Amino acid sequence: MKLCIFTRFLRQIINKQSKTKIEPMAHLSDIEIAQAKKLEHIIKIAQKLGVDEDDIEMYGKYKAKLPLHLIDDDKVAKNNLVLVTALTPTPAGEGKTTVSIGLTEGLNKIGKQATVVLREPSLGPVFGIKGGAAGGGYSQVVPMEDINLHFTGDFNAVEKANNLLSALIDNNIQNKTNNLNIDPRTILWKRVIDMNDRALRDITIGLGGTANGVPRQDGFNITPASEVMAILCMATDFDNLKKRLGDIFIGFTYQNEPVFARDLKAENAMAILLKDAVKPNLVQTLEENPAIIHGGPFANIAQGTNTILATKMGLTLSNYVVTEAGFGADLGAEKFLNIKSAFAKLNPKCVVLVATIRALRHHGGVQKEAYNTPNLDAVSDGFKNLEKHIENIRKFNIEPVVAINSFISDSDEEVNFVIEKCNSLGVHAVLSEGWAKGGEGTKELAKAVVDIVENKATQYKPLYDWKSPVTEKIETIAKEVYGAENVEYSKQAQLNLRRINRLGFNDFAICMAKTQKSFSDNEQLIGRPEGFTVTVREIEIAAGAQFLIPILGKMMRMPGLPESPASEGMTIDKNGVISGLS
Protein backbone atom coordinates (compact mmCIF):
# COMPACT_ATOMS: atom_id res chain seq x y z
CA MET A 1 0.00 0.00 0.00
CA LYS A 2 2.85 2.40 0.89
CA LEU A 3 4.44 1.72 -2.49
CA CYS A 4 1.12 2.37 -4.23
CA ILE A 5 0.67 5.75 -2.44
CA PHE A 6 4.27 6.72 -3.14
CA THR A 7 3.90 5.76 -6.80
CA ARG A 8 0.78 7.91 -7.23
CA PHE A 9 2.48 10.84 -5.46
CA LEU A 10 5.52 10.46 -7.69
CA ARG A 11 3.37 10.31 -10.78
CA GLN A 12 1.62 13.58 -9.84
CA ILE A 13 5.03 15.23 -9.66
CA ILE A 14 6.07 13.80 -13.03
CA ASN A 15 2.83 14.89 -14.69
CA LYS A 16 3.60 18.50 -13.77
CA GLN A 17 6.84 18.42 -15.72
CA SER A 18 6.80 20.08 -19.11
CA LYS A 19 10.49 20.04 -19.99
CA THR A 20 11.95 18.00 -22.84
CA LYS A 21 14.01 15.93 -20.42
CA ILE A 22 12.36 13.33 -18.22
CA GLU A 23 13.55 13.26 -14.62
CA PRO A 24 14.33 9.89 -12.99
CA MET A 25 11.36 8.18 -11.31
CA ALA A 26 13.23 7.39 -8.08
CA HIS A 27 14.49 4.25 -9.82
CA LEU A 28 11.07 2.58 -9.82
CA SER A 29 11.21 -0.36 -12.20
CA ASP A 30 8.50 -1.29 -14.68
CA ILE A 31 7.42 -4.20 -12.53
CA GLU A 32 7.23 -2.03 -9.39
CA ILE A 33 4.98 0.44 -11.20
CA ALA A 34 2.80 -2.40 -12.50
CA GLN A 35 2.58 -4.07 -9.09
CA ALA A 36 1.50 -0.78 -7.48
CA LYS A 37 -1.54 -0.53 -9.75
CA LYS A 38 -4.93 -1.63 -8.40
CA LEU A 39 -6.47 -3.35 -11.39
CA GLU A 40 -10.07 -3.06 -12.56
CA HIS A 41 -12.00 -6.32 -12.81
CA ILE A 42 -11.90 -7.55 -16.40
CA ILE A 43 -15.72 -7.45 -16.52
CA LYS A 44 -15.57 -3.64 -16.24
CA ILE A 45 -12.96 -3.44 -19.00
CA ALA A 46 -15.19 -5.57 -21.25
CA GLN A 47 -18.14 -3.29 -20.48
CA LYS A 48 -16.14 -0.33 -21.80
CA LEU A 49 -16.14 -2.16 -25.13
CA GLY A 50 -19.85 -2.90 -24.93
CA VAL A 51 -19.22 -6.59 -24.24
CA ASP A 52 -21.43 -8.34 -21.68
CA GLU A 53 -20.05 -10.50 -18.89
CA ASP A 54 -21.70 -13.55 -20.45
CA ASP A 55 -19.70 -13.01 -23.64
CA ILE A 56 -16.25 -13.26 -22.09
CA GLU A 57 -14.34 -16.29 -20.86
CA MET A 58 -12.49 -15.20 -17.72
CA TYR A 59 -9.01 -16.35 -16.76
CA GLY A 60 -9.14 -15.09 -13.18
CA LYS A 61 -10.11 -11.49 -12.37
CA TYR A 62 -7.93 -9.62 -14.84
CA LYS A 63 -7.72 -11.64 -18.07
CA ALA A 64 -10.36 -12.92 -20.45
CA LYS A 65 -10.87 -14.47 -23.86
CA LEU A 66 -13.15 -12.77 -26.40
CA PRO A 67 -15.35 -15.06 -28.57
CA LEU A 68 -14.98 -14.75 -32.34
CA HIS A 69 -18.70 -14.18 -32.92
CA LEU A 70 -18.24 -10.60 -31.70
CA ILE A 71 -16.31 -9.65 -34.86
CA ASP A 72 -18.34 -7.48 -37.27
CA ASP A 73 -16.66 -6.80 -40.63
CA ASP A 74 -18.89 -3.78 -41.31
CA LYS A 75 -17.61 -2.10 -38.15
CA VAL A 76 -14.05 -3.16 -38.98
CA ALA A 77 -14.27 -1.25 -42.27
CA LYS A 78 -15.65 1.91 -40.63
CA ASN A 79 -13.22 2.32 -37.74
CA ASN A 80 -9.66 3.63 -37.68
CA LEU A 81 -6.48 1.55 -37.68
CA VAL A 82 -3.17 3.13 -36.62
CA LEU A 83 0.11 1.23 -37.01
CA VAL A 84 3.11 1.92 -34.77
CA THR A 85 6.55 1.01 -36.12
CA ALA A 86 10.08 2.34 -35.71
CA LEU A 87 13.40 3.23 -37.24
CA THR A 88 16.09 0.52 -37.31
CA PRO A 89 16.47 -0.32 -33.60
CA THR A 90 19.33 -0.76 -31.20
CA PRO A 91 19.45 -4.16 -29.43
CA ALA A 92 17.38 -2.85 -26.49
CA GLY A 93 14.53 -1.70 -28.75
CA GLU A 94 13.16 1.82 -29.12
CA GLY A 95 9.84 1.54 -27.28
CA LYS A 96 7.18 0.75 -29.90
CA THR A 97 5.03 -1.08 -27.37
CA THR A 98 5.42 1.72 -24.82
CA VAL A 99 4.46 4.31 -27.45
CA SER A 100 1.54 2.17 -28.67
CA ILE A 101 0.12 1.92 -25.16
CA GLY A 102 0.85 5.57 -24.38
CA LEU A 103 -0.79 6.69 -27.61
CA THR A 104 -3.89 4.66 -26.74
CA GLU A 105 -4.03 6.37 -23.34
CA GLY A 106 -3.59 9.76 -25.03
CA LEU A 107 -6.35 9.10 -27.57
CA ASN A 108 -8.76 8.21 -24.78
CA LYS A 109 -7.74 11.35 -22.88
CA ILE A 110 -8.68 13.55 -25.86
CA GLY A 111 -12.07 11.86 -26.18
CA LYS A 112 -11.44 9.10 -28.71
CA GLN A 113 -12.51 5.55 -27.94
CA ALA A 114 -9.27 3.63 -28.44
CA THR A 115 -7.99 0.11 -27.80
CA VAL A 116 -4.40 -1.07 -28.09
CA VAL A 117 -3.92 -4.40 -29.89
CA LEU A 118 -0.54 -6.04 -29.34
CA ARG A 119 1.43 -9.25 -29.73
CA GLU A 120 2.05 -11.65 -26.87
CA PRO A 121 5.60 -11.69 -25.48
CA SER A 122 7.92 -14.65 -26.03
CA LEU A 123 9.86 -16.15 -23.13
CA GLY A 124 13.04 -16.12 -25.23
CA PRO A 125 13.52 -12.33 -25.17
CA VAL A 126 12.00 -12.06 -21.67
CA PHE A 127 14.87 -14.12 -20.25
CA GLY A 128 17.36 -13.04 -22.92
CA ILE A 129 18.34 -9.47 -23.74
CA LYS A 130 15.33 -7.51 -24.99
CA GLY A 131 12.97 -8.09 -22.08
CA GLY A 132 9.21 -8.43 -22.16
CA ALA A 133 6.62 -6.76 -24.33
CA ALA A 134 4.19 -5.16 -21.91
CA GLY A 135 5.41 -1.59 -22.36
CA GLY A 136 7.33 0.45 -19.82
CA GLY A 137 7.04 3.11 -17.14
CA TYR A 138 3.50 4.50 -16.99
CA SER A 139 2.57 3.08 -20.39
CA GLN A 140 2.08 -0.60 -19.63
CA VAL A 141 -0.47 -3.34 -20.04
CA VAL A 142 -1.30 -5.32 -16.92
CA PRO A 143 -1.16 -7.81 -15.23
CA MET A 144 2.41 -7.37 -16.45
CA GLU A 145 3.92 -10.54 -14.95
CA ASP A 146 1.18 -12.77 -16.36
CA ILE A 147 1.38 -11.21 -19.82
CA ASN A 148 5.17 -11.57 -19.99
CA LEU A 149 5.16 -15.16 -18.73
CA HIS A 150 2.58 -17.88 -19.50
CA PHE A 151 -0.42 -15.52 -19.94
CA THR A 152 -3.45 -17.58 -21.09
CA GLY A 153 -1.42 -20.46 -22.50
CA ASP A 154 -1.59 -19.51 -26.19
CA PHE A 155 2.14 -20.03 -26.80
CA ASN A 156 1.97 -23.40 -25.09
CA ALA A 157 -0.91 -24.41 -27.35
CA VAL A 158 1.00 -23.32 -30.47
CA GLU A 159 4.07 -25.24 -29.30
CA LYS A 160 2.07 -28.39 -28.59
CA ALA A 161 0.22 -28.25 -31.92
CA ASN A 162 3.52 -27.80 -33.76
CA ASN A 163 5.21 -30.65 -31.92
CA LEU A 164 2.20 -32.94 -32.29
CA LEU A 165 2.74 -32.72 -36.04
CA SER A 166 6.44 -33.53 -35.54
CA ALA A 167 5.51 -36.59 -33.49
CA LEU A 168 3.00 -37.72 -36.13
CA ILE A 169 5.63 -37.38 -38.86
CA ASP A 170 8.16 -39.54 -37.02
CA ASN A 171 5.48 -42.03 -35.99
CA ASN A 172 4.45 -42.40 -39.63
CA ILE A 173 8.04 -43.04 -40.70
CA GLN A 174 8.37 -45.68 -37.94
CA ASN A 175 5.08 -47.38 -38.91
CA LYS A 176 5.84 -50.27 -41.27
CA THR A 177 2.29 -51.16 -42.27
CA ASN A 178 0.52 -47.83 -42.71
CA ASN A 179 2.95 -45.11 -43.71
CA LEU A 180 3.10 -42.43 -46.38
CA ASN A 181 6.60 -43.46 -47.48
CA ILE A 182 8.01 -40.09 -46.38
CA ASP A 183 11.66 -39.55 -47.24
CA PRO A 184 13.21 -38.34 -43.93
CA ARG A 185 15.89 -36.42 -45.83
CA THR A 186 13.25 -34.08 -47.26
CA ILE A 187 11.37 -33.21 -44.07
CA LEU A 188 11.21 -29.44 -43.63
CA TRP A 189 9.11 -29.35 -40.46
CA LYS A 190 10.95 -28.57 -37.22
CA ARG A 191 10.05 -28.82 -33.58
CA VAL A 192 9.70 -25.61 -31.52
CA ILE A 193 10.25 -24.37 -27.98
CA ASP A 194 9.63 -20.89 -26.57
CA MET A 195 13.17 -20.32 -25.37
CA ASN A 196 16.44 -18.97 -26.76
CA ASP A 197 18.45 -22.21 -26.97
CA ARG A 198 21.14 -22.35 -29.64
CA ALA A 199 22.07 -25.95 -28.72
CA LEU A 200 18.78 -27.13 -30.27
CA ARG A 201 19.30 -25.59 -33.72
CA ASP A 202 20.60 -28.82 -35.24
CA ILE A 203 20.05 -32.16 -33.53
CA THR A 204 19.85 -35.85 -34.38
CA ILE A 205 16.77 -37.76 -33.22
CA GLY A 206 15.76 -41.41 -33.19
CA LEU A 207 18.96 -42.71 -31.59
CA GLY A 208 19.11 -45.64 -29.19
CA GLY A 209 17.82 -48.50 -31.28
CA THR A 210 14.87 -49.40 -33.48
CA ALA A 211 12.30 -48.89 -30.73
CA ASN A 212 13.18 -45.18 -30.55
CA GLY A 213 12.32 -44.25 -34.11
CA VAL A 214 14.23 -43.71 -37.33
CA PRO A 215 17.40 -41.63 -36.88
CA ARG A 216 17.34 -38.39 -38.81
CA GLN A 217 18.58 -34.84 -38.65
CA ASP A 218 16.14 -32.40 -37.05
CA GLY A 219 16.19 -29.10 -35.19
CA PHE A 220 14.19 -26.58 -33.18
CA ASN A 221 12.92 -23.12 -34.04
CA ILE A 222 11.69 -20.70 -31.40
CA THR A 223 7.89 -20.84 -31.02
CA PRO A 224 7.24 -17.36 -32.53
CA ALA A 225 8.87 -18.65 -35.74
CA SER A 226 6.54 -21.67 -35.95
CA GLU A 227 4.28 -21.84 -38.97
CA VAL A 228 1.49 -22.71 -36.53
CA MET A 229 1.99 -19.26 -34.98
CA ALA A 230 1.92 -17.71 -38.45
CA ILE A 231 -1.28 -19.61 -39.26
CA LEU A 232 -2.90 -18.50 -35.99
CA CYS A 233 -2.09 -14.91 -36.93
CA MET A 234 -3.37 -15.22 -40.52
CA ALA A 235 -6.55 -17.22 -39.83
CA THR A 236 -9.88 -15.48 -40.41
CA ASP A 237 -12.04 -17.95 -38.44
CA PHE A 238 -11.80 -21.41 -36.90
CA ASP A 239 -12.60 -23.27 -40.12
CA ASN A 240 -9.94 -21.26 -41.95
CA LEU A 241 -7.48 -22.10 -39.16
CA LYS A 242 -8.17 -25.81 -39.58
CA LYS A 243 -7.80 -25.68 -43.37
CA ARG A 244 -4.50 -23.82 -43.08
CA LEU A 245 -3.18 -26.39 -40.61
CA GLY A 246 -3.98 -29.12 -43.12
CA ASP A 247 -2.13 -27.19 -45.84
CA ILE A 248 1.21 -27.26 -43.98
CA PHE A 249 3.87 -28.64 -46.34
CA ILE A 250 6.04 -31.26 -44.67
CA GLY A 251 8.33 -32.72 -47.34
CA PHE A 252 8.32 -35.40 -50.04
CA THR A 253 7.82 -39.14 -50.37
CA TYR A 254 10.48 -41.39 -51.85
CA GLN A 255 8.45 -41.07 -55.07
CA ASN A 256 9.00 -37.27 -54.91
CA GLU A 257 5.35 -36.52 -54.17
CA PRO A 258 4.57 -33.66 -51.76
CA VAL A 259 3.29 -34.48 -48.28
CA PHE A 260 1.01 -32.17 -46.30
CA ALA A 261 -0.27 -32.25 -42.72
CA ARG A 262 -3.70 -33.27 -44.01
CA ASP A 263 -2.14 -36.46 -45.41
CA LEU A 264 -1.35 -37.40 -41.81
CA LYS A 265 -4.89 -36.42 -40.75
CA ALA A 266 -3.24 -33.97 -38.36
CA GLU A 267 -5.30 -30.82 -38.82
CA ASN A 268 -8.21 -31.69 -36.53
CA ALA A 269 -6.02 -32.78 -33.64
CA MET A 270 -3.87 -29.66 -34.05
CA ALA A 271 -6.99 -27.48 -34.16
CA ILE A 272 -8.28 -29.11 -30.97
CA LEU A 273 -5.13 -27.94 -29.21
CA LEU A 274 -5.73 -24.41 -30.55
CA LYS A 275 -9.47 -24.18 -29.83
CA ASP A 276 -8.97 -21.61 -27.06
CA ALA A 277 -5.76 -20.07 -28.38
CA VAL A 278 -7.64 -18.82 -31.44
CA LYS A 279 -9.64 -16.40 -29.26
CA PRO A 280 -8.09 -12.96 -28.59
CA ASN A 281 -7.12 -12.03 -25.02
CA LEU A 282 -8.50 -8.98 -23.20
CA VAL A 283 -6.52 -7.17 -20.48
CA GLN A 284 -6.10 -3.49 -19.51
CA THR A 285 -3.65 -0.60 -19.53
CA LEU A 286 -2.46 1.21 -16.41
CA GLU A 287 -5.15 3.83 -17.10
CA GLU A 288 -7.83 1.12 -17.34
CA ASN A 289 -8.30 1.27 -21.09
CA PRO A 290 -8.88 -1.97 -23.04
CA ALA A 291 -5.94 -3.91 -24.43
CA ILE A 292 -6.24 -6.93 -26.73
CA ILE A 293 -3.14 -9.12 -26.90
CA HIS A 294 -2.97 -12.10 -29.24
CA GLY A 295 -0.36 -14.00 -31.23
CA GLY A 296 3.36 -13.38 -31.12
CA PRO A 297 5.50 -13.91 -34.24
CA PHE A 298 8.84 -12.08 -34.40
CA ALA A 299 9.28 -9.62 -37.27
CA ASN A 300 12.81 -10.63 -38.26
CA ILE A 301 12.12 -14.38 -38.66
CA ALA A 302 8.31 -14.33 -39.08
CA GLN A 303 5.60 -11.80 -39.98
CA GLY A 304 5.84 -9.78 -36.75
CA THR A 305 2.20 -8.80 -36.26
CA ASN A 306 -0.63 -9.84 -33.95
CA THR A 307 -3.52 -11.92 -35.26
CA ILE A 308 -5.96 -10.74 -37.90
CA LEU A 309 -8.72 -11.83 -35.50
CA ALA A 310 -7.39 -9.58 -32.70
CA THR A 311 -7.10 -6.56 -34.99
CA LYS A 312 -10.61 -7.11 -36.32
CA MET A 313 -11.91 -7.61 -32.78
CA GLY A 314 -10.42 -4.28 -31.76
CA LEU A 315 -11.83 -2.52 -34.82
CA THR A 316 -15.26 -4.02 -34.12
CA LEU A 317 -15.32 -2.75 -30.54
CA SER A 318 -13.46 0.59 -30.79
CA ASN A 319 -13.34 3.66 -33.01
CA TYR A 320 -9.54 3.66 -32.91
CA VAL A 321 -7.18 0.69 -32.79
CA VAL A 322 -3.49 1.25 -32.14
CA THR A 323 -1.35 -1.74 -33.10
CA GLU A 324 2.35 -2.38 -33.60
CA ALA A 325 4.61 -4.42 -35.84
CA GLY A 326 7.98 -5.72 -34.72
CA PHE A 327 11.46 -4.23 -35.09
CA GLY A 328 12.01 -1.51 -37.72
CA ALA A 329 9.59 -0.49 -40.45
CA ASP A 330 11.66 -2.44 -43.00
CA LEU A 331 10.53 -5.64 -41.25
CA GLY A 332 7.32 -5.47 -39.20
CA ALA A 333 5.62 -2.61 -41.02
CA GLU A 334 6.55 -3.96 -44.46
CA LYS A 335 4.96 -7.30 -43.55
CA PHE A 336 1.97 -5.69 -41.85
CA LEU A 337 1.25 -3.71 -45.01
CA ASN A 338 2.21 -6.21 -47.72
CA ILE A 339 0.94 -9.38 -46.02
CA LYS A 340 -1.56 -8.84 -43.20
CA SER A 341 -3.37 -5.73 -44.45
CA ALA A 342 -3.41 -6.93 -48.05
CA PHE A 343 -4.87 -10.33 -47.16
CA ALA A 344 -7.33 -9.15 -44.48
CA LYS A 345 -8.38 -6.06 -46.47
CA LEU A 346 -7.43 -3.72 -43.63
CA ASN A 347 -6.81 -0.03 -44.32
CA PRO A 348 -4.32 1.53 -41.89
CA LYS A 349 -4.91 5.28 -41.93
CA CYS A 350 -1.77 6.47 -40.16
CA VAL A 351 1.67 5.09 -39.33
CA VAL A 352 3.52 6.28 -36.24
CA LEU A 353 7.29 5.99 -36.66
CA VAL A 354 9.00 5.72 -33.29
CA ALA A 355 12.45 7.29 -33.12
CA THR A 356 14.84 7.73 -30.24
CA ILE A 357 17.78 10.08 -29.97
CA ARG A 358 19.76 7.07 -28.74
CA ALA A 359 19.11 5.12 -31.96
CA LEU A 360 19.93 8.15 -34.11
CA ARG A 361 23.27 8.49 -32.31
CA HIS A 362 23.86 4.79 -32.98
CA HIS A 363 23.17 5.18 -36.70
CA GLY A 364 25.48 8.19 -36.66
CA GLY A 365 28.35 5.92 -35.67
CA VAL A 366 28.39 6.26 -31.87
CA GLN A 367 29.51 3.18 -29.93
CA LYS A 368 27.25 1.56 -27.33
CA GLU A 369 29.09 3.01 -24.34
CA ALA A 370 28.33 6.54 -25.63
CA TYR A 371 24.64 5.99 -26.52
CA ASN A 372 23.55 8.19 -23.63
CA THR A 373 25.94 11.07 -24.31
CA PRO A 374 24.53 14.02 -26.30
CA ASN A 375 26.07 14.18 -29.78
CA LEU A 376 24.30 16.45 -32.25
CA ASP A 377 26.66 15.56 -35.10
CA ALA A 378 25.91 11.85 -34.69
CA VAL A 379 22.16 12.53 -34.55
CA SER A 380 22.48 14.54 -37.75
CA ASP A 381 24.35 11.71 -39.48
CA GLY A 382 21.97 9.08 -38.12
CA PHE A 383 18.85 10.93 -39.27
CA LYS A 384 19.27 9.42 -42.75
CA ASN A 385 18.06 6.09 -41.31
CA LEU A 386 14.82 7.67 -40.10
CA GLU A 387 14.46 9.54 -43.38
CA LYS A 388 14.59 6.27 -45.36
CA HIS A 389 11.84 4.79 -43.17
CA ILE A 390 9.72 7.92 -43.76
CA GLU A 391 10.19 7.50 -47.51
CA ASN A 392 9.22 3.83 -47.28
CA ILE A 393 5.97 4.49 -45.41
CA ARG A 394 4.97 7.05 -48.02
CA LYS A 395 5.48 4.42 -50.73
CA PHE A 396 2.44 2.66 -49.25
CA ASN A 397 0.42 5.86 -49.70
CA ILE A 398 0.27 6.49 -45.94
CA GLU A 399 1.36 9.64 -44.16
CA PRO A 400 3.58 9.03 -41.11
CA VAL A 401 3.86 10.83 -37.80
CA VAL A 402 7.22 10.64 -36.02
CA ALA A 403 7.06 9.98 -32.26
CA ILE A 404 10.31 10.85 -30.49
CA ASN A 405 10.27 8.47 -27.55
CA SER A 406 11.83 10.61 -24.84
CA PHE A 407 14.82 9.54 -22.73
CA ILE A 408 16.52 11.43 -19.90
CA SER A 409 19.77 11.54 -21.91
CA ASP A 410 18.17 13.49 -24.79
CA SER A 411 19.33 17.08 -25.17
CA ASP A 412 16.98 19.86 -26.24
CA GLU A 413 19.26 20.59 -29.21
CA GLU A 414 19.03 17.01 -30.47
CA VAL A 415 15.26 16.82 -30.06
CA ASN A 416 14.71 20.18 -31.76
CA PHE A 417 16.99 19.14 -34.61
CA VAL A 418 14.91 16.01 -35.28
CA ILE A 419 11.64 17.94 -35.12
CA GLU A 420 12.94 20.57 -37.55
CA LYS A 421 14.35 17.97 -39.96
CA CYS A 422 11.04 16.10 -39.97
CA ASN A 423 9.14 19.35 -40.52
CA SER A 424 11.38 20.09 -43.52
CA LEU A 425 10.19 16.76 -44.98
CA GLY A 426 6.55 17.68 -44.34
CA VAL A 427 6.29 15.22 -41.44
CA HIS A 428 4.83 16.09 -38.06
CA ALA A 429 7.25 15.04 -35.28
CA VAL A 430 6.07 14.99 -31.66
CA LEU A 431 7.82 14.30 -28.38
CA SER A 432 6.25 11.22 -26.76
CA GLU A 433 6.47 11.13 -22.95
CA GLY A 434 4.20 8.19 -22.24
CA TRP A 435 6.88 6.33 -20.31
CA ALA A 436 6.97 9.01 -17.60
CA LYS A 437 3.51 10.54 -17.86
CA GLY A 438 1.17 7.96 -19.35
CA GLY A 439 -1.64 9.47 -21.43
CA GLU A 440 -0.83 13.00 -20.26
CA GLY A 441 2.50 12.68 -22.03
CA THR A 442 1.04 11.57 -25.36
CA LYS A 443 -1.90 13.91 -25.92
CA GLU A 444 0.00 15.93 -28.53
CA LEU A 445 0.94 12.73 -30.33
CA ALA A 446 -2.70 11.62 -30.19
CA LYS A 447 -3.82 14.94 -31.71
CA ALA A 448 -1.27 14.59 -34.53
CA VAL A 449 -2.53 11.07 -35.28
CA VAL A 450 -6.18 12.15 -35.26
CA ASP A 451 -5.33 14.99 -37.66
CA ILE A 452 -3.89 12.48 -40.15
CA VAL A 453 -6.72 9.97 -39.69
CA GLU A 454 -9.58 12.46 -39.94
CA ASN A 455 -8.17 14.96 -42.43
CA LYS A 456 -5.41 13.37 -44.52
CA ALA A 457 -5.98 9.61 -44.65
CA THR A 458 -5.96 7.90 -48.06
CA GLN A 459 -6.40 4.32 -49.23
CA TYR A 460 -3.14 2.53 -48.55
CA LYS A 461 -1.65 0.35 -51.29
CA PRO A 462 0.74 -2.61 -50.96
CA LEU A 463 4.04 -2.52 -52.84
CA TYR A 464 3.49 -5.72 -54.81
CA ASP A 465 0.77 -7.97 -56.15
CA TRP A 466 0.86 -11.45 -54.60
CA LYS A 467 0.39 -12.91 -58.09
CA SER A 468 3.64 -11.40 -59.36
CA PRO A 469 6.63 -13.73 -59.93
CA VAL A 470 8.42 -14.74 -56.72
CA THR A 471 11.74 -13.14 -57.64
CA GLU A 472 9.97 -9.91 -58.61
CA LYS A 473 8.29 -9.74 -55.20
CA ILE A 474 11.57 -10.42 -53.38
CA GLU A 475 13.41 -7.81 -55.41
CA THR A 476 10.67 -5.22 -54.89
CA ILE A 477 11.13 -5.50 -51.13
CA ALA A 478 14.92 -5.60 -51.32
CA LYS A 479 15.25 -2.61 -53.63
CA GLU A 480 12.28 -0.43 -52.67
CA VAL A 481 12.29 -1.00 -48.90
CA TYR A 482 15.86 -1.96 -48.05
CA GLY A 483 17.53 0.17 -50.72
CA ALA A 484 19.55 -2.74 -52.15
CA GLU A 485 21.17 -2.45 -55.55
CA ASN A 486 21.13 -6.17 -56.34
CA VAL A 487 19.70 -9.48 -55.13
CA GLU A 488 21.70 -12.70 -55.43
CA TYR A 489 20.34 -16.23 -55.01
CA SER A 490 22.45 -19.10 -53.67
CA LYS A 491 22.31 -22.49 -55.38
CA GLN A 492 20.03 -23.68 -52.58
CA ALA A 493 17.70 -20.72 -53.11
CA GLN A 494 17.57 -21.44 -56.84
CA LEU A 495 16.61 -25.05 -56.07
CA ASN A 496 13.95 -23.75 -53.69
CA LEU A 497 12.53 -21.49 -56.43
CA ARG A 498 12.16 -24.47 -58.76
CA ARG A 499 10.45 -26.46 -56.00
CA ILE A 500 8.07 -23.55 -55.29
CA ASN A 501 7.17 -23.37 -58.97
CA ARG A 502 6.58 -27.11 -59.18
CA LEU A 503 4.30 -27.06 -56.12
CA GLY A 504 2.29 -24.11 -57.44
CA PHE A 505 3.11 -21.75 -54.57
CA ASN A 506 4.13 -18.78 -56.71
CA ASP A 507 1.13 -16.69 -55.57
CA PHE A 508 2.15 -16.65 -51.91
CA ALA A 509 3.21 -13.48 -50.10
CA ILE A 510 6.87 -12.88 -49.23
CA CYS A 511 7.93 -12.92 -45.57
CA MET A 512 11.61 -11.99 -45.44
CA ALA A 513 13.87 -13.32 -42.66
CA LYS A 514 16.53 -10.64 -42.21
CA THR A 515 18.60 -9.03 -39.50
CA GLN A 516 16.75 -6.29 -37.64
CA LYS A 517 19.97 -4.32 -37.14
CA SER A 518 20.36 -2.99 -40.67
CA PHE A 519 18.43 -2.23 -43.85
CA SER A 520 20.79 -4.74 -45.46
CA ASP A 521 21.45 -8.41 -44.65
CA ASN A 522 24.71 -7.37 -42.96
CA GLU A 523 24.12 -6.15 -39.40
CA GLN A 524 27.31 -4.07 -39.51
CA LEU A 525 25.87 -1.72 -42.17
CA ILE A 526 24.08 0.81 -39.98
CA GLY A 527 22.51 4.12 -40.99
CA ARG A 528 21.31 4.15 -44.59
CA PRO A 529 23.58 1.83 -46.58
CA GLU A 530 23.61 2.12 -50.36
CA GLY A 531 24.92 0.08 -53.27
CA PHE A 532 24.74 -3.21 -51.37
CA THR A 533 23.66 -6.68 -52.50
CA VAL A 534 21.41 -8.93 -50.44
CA THR A 535 21.89 -12.69 -50.66
CA VAL A 536 18.95 -15.07 -50.48
CA ARG A 537 20.45 -18.13 -48.79
CA GLU A 538 17.34 -20.31 -49.01
CA ILE A 539 13.57 -19.98 -49.27
CA GLU A 540 11.34 -21.81 -46.82
CA ILE A 541 7.73 -22.65 -47.61
CA ALA A 542 4.87 -21.85 -45.21
CA ALA A 543 2.00 -23.21 -47.29
CA GLY A 544 -0.53 -23.03 -44.46
CA ALA A 545 0.27 -19.39 -43.78
CA GLN A 546 0.44 -18.79 -47.54
CA PHE A 547 3.80 -17.13 -47.62
CA LEU A 548 7.36 -17.87 -48.66
CA ILE A 549 10.26 -17.11 -46.34
CA PRO A 550 13.46 -15.99 -48.10
CA ILE A 551 16.26 -16.23 -45.54
CA LEU A 552 18.80 -13.47 -46.07
CA GLY A 553 22.40 -13.64 -44.92
CA LYS A 554 23.12 -15.44 -41.65
CA MET A 555 19.65 -15.29 -40.09
CA MET A 556 18.66 -18.17 -37.80
CA ARG A 557 15.18 -19.03 -36.57
CA MET A 558 16.37 -20.18 -33.16
CA PRO A 559 18.09 -17.37 -31.21
CA GLY A 560 20.69 -17.87 -28.48
CA LEU A 561 21.02 -16.25 -25.08
CA PRO A 562 23.48 -13.37 -24.53
CA GLU A 563 26.52 -13.65 -22.26
CA SER A 564 24.56 -12.06 -19.41
CA PRO A 565 20.89 -13.02 -19.87
CA ALA A 566 18.16 -10.98 -18.20
CA SER A 567 17.23 -14.05 -16.17
CA GLU A 568 20.29 -13.45 -13.97
CA GLY A 569 18.71 -10.29 -12.57
CA MET A 570 15.34 -11.82 -11.69
CA THR A 571 14.18 -12.91 -8.24
CA ILE A 572 11.01 -14.22 -6.63
CA ASP A 573 10.32 -14.17 -2.89
CA LYS A 574 8.45 -16.62 -0.68
CA ASN A 575 5.20 -14.73 -1.33
CA GLY A 576 5.55 -15.08 -5.09
CA VAL A 577 6.48 -11.42 -5.66
CA ILE A 578 8.71 -11.12 -8.73
CA SER A 579 11.40 -8.49 -9.27
CA GLY A 580 13.77 -7.86 -12.17
CA LEU A 581 11.20 -8.68 -14.86
CA SER A 582 10.88 -5.95 -17.48
Predicted region positions:
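Intrinsically disordered, low-complexity serine/threonine-rich segments
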Residues: I14-S18, D194-M195
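Flexible phosphate-sensing "switch/lid" loops adjacent to ATP/NTP-binding sites
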Residues: I22-S582
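Generic secretory/membrane-interface signal
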Residues: F9-N15, A114, S318
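Charged/polar low-complexity intrinsically disordered segments
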Residues: F9-Q12, K19-K21, G576
